[in-house]
Each structure stands twice: as structure tokens, then as C-alpha cells.
Amino acid sequence: ITVPIAKNNVKYNQINFVDMPNAVQSNISLTNNVDLKMNHPEYHAVLIANKILGGGFNSYLNMNLREEHGYTYGARSSIGTDKYASRFTAGASVRNAVTDSAVVETLKEINKIKTEFVTPEELSNAKAKYVGDFVLALERPSTVARYALNIKTNNLPEDFYSTYLEKINAVTAEDVKRVANTYFK
């Protein structure tokens, strides 16, 4: 099998608009390619940064686009850690009339996490969410099997999951800002 090489990201922001005259809402998606593997030293910091930006209800994106402006039922971001090619995506489905405003606000929140330090409370809440999810997931046998498979298929160190919480809790506000600048374009 030949695995295609991911294309480089564009050098500037570009907007591709697809006009759908009968659509009642717009789906906005801000996306860039990333090269992030689970065995990368910045992996845990990227998880925390994404959680704060758009990985939960209290994230920057959701609080702005849903709670502050009422543009959407939910805004989110995600980042992949695929073995070959991955991407960062931030977006939401919004009313047509606020598409442009939602894009501006999404870019504003991405810029915020890249230029400002997250608060101690935001950092603590994101870490607590990962710790809680990790502990609960261990109660399912399928999770333990998936973790063992991940170690083999993703070239992870044998202690990857036994040091997972330690690495999550070691993430700093400086780490979040640094990785946001690297991975959230």
C-alpha cells in the first residue's frame, strides 16, 4: 500500500464558499493539516489545548458562538493523531445570516488561544476532564484492549498509558500557547 503524502498547508487563510441556495444553515469548517502522532512529545499538551479551544461545552468556541452570540447549538474543534495524515478542524453549523460573523468569531478564538495564556482555572478544568475520562474508560475491557493495540500500532512506549495522567497534569499554560501556535492554523 502506498500512503499519500499530506499536502502542505496554504501560506495564508483562504475561504472556499459553496453556495447552496436552499440551505437553511451553513457548515463552517476551519481546517489545516497537522503532523501529530501519539508518540510526539507535545501530544498531551495538544490534547489540553484542543479541549480548551473547542473540545467541550465550556470551550472557547462553544461559549462564544453558542452562549454569547447564539449562532449555533454547538461549536467544536478536534485534532487528529492518525498514523499517516491528520488535521485540525474547528467549526459549527450556523444560521445562514451569521455565517460571516461565525467565521470571524471562530478565528478570534483560535487567535486568543495562540496569543493569550489560558487561565489556571481553564487549564485545571481541562486536565480534570481528561483525568476523569481516562479513569472511567479503564473500567471497560474494550478500552484496555484498545490501549494495548495503540501501543503496538502507534509505536508508543510501553509506559505510555501508565504515565498518561502524569503527562496530562504536567501541561502548563505556556505549553498550551506554544502548541496552539504550532497546530492551530
Predicted regions and their residues:
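Non-catalytic beta-strand/loop surface segments
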Residues: 1-39, 54-101, 122-129, 143-147, ...
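A common structural junction motif
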Residues: 1, 108-117
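Hard-cation-handling environments
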Residues: 140
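Short amphipathic C-terminal alpha-helix that caps PH/PH-like domains
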Residues: 49, 103-110
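Acidic/polar loop-and-plug regions of large Gram-negative outer-membrane beta-barrel proteins
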Residues: 158
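Non-catalytic accessory/assembly modules
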Residues: 133, 150-153
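PPIase-associated folding chaperone regions across multiple families
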Residues: 41-48
